[in-house]
Amino acid sequence: MHEPAFWHRPSSLLSRLLMPVGALYGAVAARRLMRTGMRAGVPVICVGNYHVGGAGKTPTVIALAGILRSLGETPVVLSRGYGGRLHGPVHVDPHRHTAADVGDEPLMMAWTIPVIVSRQRAAGIAPARALGASVILMDDGFQNPALAKDISLIVIDRARGLGNGQVFPAGPLRAPLPPQLARTDALVIVGFGPAADDVAASIGARGGLVLPARLIPDDASVVALRGRRVYAFAGIGDPQRFFRSLRACGIDVAAERAFPDHHPFSQRDVADLQTAAERDGLTLVTTEKDLARLRNSEDLAAFAQAVVAFAVTLAFDDEAVLRSFLTDRIGRARR
């Protein structure tokens, strides 16, 4: 879905009109947060958002998996598989499954990390442990009470923040902010800007850990696009962040097109992009997540060959602090 513009305005008539609905939605969500979930038998680290849409969860999960491996752990990702048709539980095989089967994010992560997709998260525990999981990395699901979480990390974009701070549909929040803050162990603030400062201060005041991080473009991606004029397109939670990242690397973005998050590209979409790029002599560029969806469609795979993926990795400003935190909290979870 495309986020409505009024979600990111301090005050609007439409937001005020929707506040009663948001209050009902928020009351239900807040009660769900109070429930105690099933214990997995191994430590569970949840990577989530306070709001709908994306804010860098997938690169955060990938970065955490690398750190956990360096600590001697065997992480397995547990995902709901948003956008996929399979309910699971299923062990994602990137050579066999498609984005239509398991969702684009699990498919992309499965190239480097074992991923279990399970619509019912609790049902994914046994297959994750069968893969040797010493730690389960839960991709999203912070507001889902099915599983008990030993560590909850929330990701926020520092340029975007939490919009108008209202609960869906009056704003982007999935639940009222206070009960979400109370269940947050660490806050990952990504990028640059002041929009997440108030939340970071609240987490710090509660004794939570605040972890600044940044998305680092892959050198090969930058080199591949240097000196070219590009047509950038993306169907992610915040396409504008992707476009800003390209420009920040000195890439000449001559045209851009934003699609809804997890957008299922059609032949018409592809034809429009290709026609415009060829007409103006532009190189097509998109995110790794979007390219994963394109490559895994038989009808669109040929088009995908002509598209450059702009790859990024997430790096924490102080990884040593995070490593110490994970070691301590995982150790506590095992006692």
Swiss-Prot record:
Its EC number is 2.7.1.130. The keyword NADP does not apply. One of its GO terms (molecular function) is ATP binding. GO terms for biological process: lipid A biosynthetic process; lipopolysaccharide core region biosynthetic process. Pathway: Glycolipid biosynthesis; lipid IV(A) biosynthesis; lipid IV(A) from (3R)-3-hydroxytetradecanoyl-[acyl-carrier-protein] and UDP-N-acetyl-alpha-D-glucosamine: step 6/6. Pfam families: LpxK. Belongs to the LpxK family. This is Tetraacyldisaccharide 4'-kinase. It comes from Nitrobacter hamburgensis (strain DSM 10229 / NCIMB 13809 / X14). The lineage of its organism: Bacteria, Pseudomonadati, Pseudomonadota, Alphaproteobacteria, Hyphomicrobiales.
